[in-house]
Amino acid sequence: MSPSSVKRVWMYWTKTKMLLSIKKFGRKNKILDEESVELILEVNKEQNLGARRLEKIIEFQHGKHIPHNAIHKVLLHHGLANVNRNKSKRRKPWVRYERKHSLSLVHLDWHDGKFNGKKVCAVLDDSSRCILAGGEFDAETTENSISLIQEALDNFGWLTSISQAMTDHGTQFYANKRDKNGDADSRFENFLEKNKIKHIKARVKHPQSNGKFEKWNDTYEKNRYRFDNFDNFVNWYNTIRFHESLDTKWYLQTPDIAFWARLPEGCKLKMFLDRMETELNVGDRI
């Protein structure tokens, strides 16, 4: 305590014979109006994310700034968040790597789903984090893996072919028994080669190589129960949920928006010409 504070307390005591009350430091707690509380609950129901993330989304979508601490209190009050006393206040520096263009690299992986006991696999675009194809299966098989790549090609191959596919060394993707030349008869690898897709194998015992897919698995486990089927979940993930890894300084993005925005320029030109041709054909028929 500074000498001036001691003097002030002493002078107050000599005049009033009472202790000087100490005011609370910091800002007063902000009391949110009912409209703000309803907005927080509405956006949380749609996005199912934490307070720090909801703060950015609410400001981006609705132009209204609500501090994340106030949002967290609302979530706690409604049983939508937990108190985490061990959470670090300082976030670690975050470095990410991603491809510049959509369809230049996709990730595949199998996951044991806890929601319904199914085996889950998807084709995830590296640049946009968009799910290009996926499903819940009874077994992890090479046939199912191939069918998902084929589905992605059927849906988006008219734009441009997938350049590369990254997987782990699972038997669904890779034949571990090889001859002296390093060759093996793997149906999945043969399928990729036939479609001119380069197969990239993630480093063994190095989960960071497929970290984007691990993040998607986590999102699946936290949100799958909210949807009647897998397709509805993927539609929410692709088109409604703002993905933090896609944030820019000026705007937020869903994987679907990022996918179309990050296509190579040649693909965008092709889309424009195809649309012009369609409109001209419609005009000729009229």
Regions found by a protein language model. Name each.
Residues 19-105, 183-189, 255-258:
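Basic, flexible linker segments flanking DNA-binding modules
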Residues 64, 69, 76-124, 128-130, ...:
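Mobile-element integrase/transposase regions
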Residues 167-169, 178-222, 253-254:
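RNase H-like two-metal-ion nuclease catalytic core shared by retroviral integrases
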Residues 2, 13-14, 61-62, 78, ...:
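The DNA-recognition helices of helix-turn-helix-type DNA-binding domains
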Residues 12, 42, 191-194, 236:
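Alpha-helical scaffold elements within enzyme catalytic domains, especially in hydrolases
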Residues 218-286:
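C-terminal domain-tail junction helix/linker
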Residues 4-8, 69:
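Key DNA-contact positions within bacterial/archaeal DNA-binding proteins
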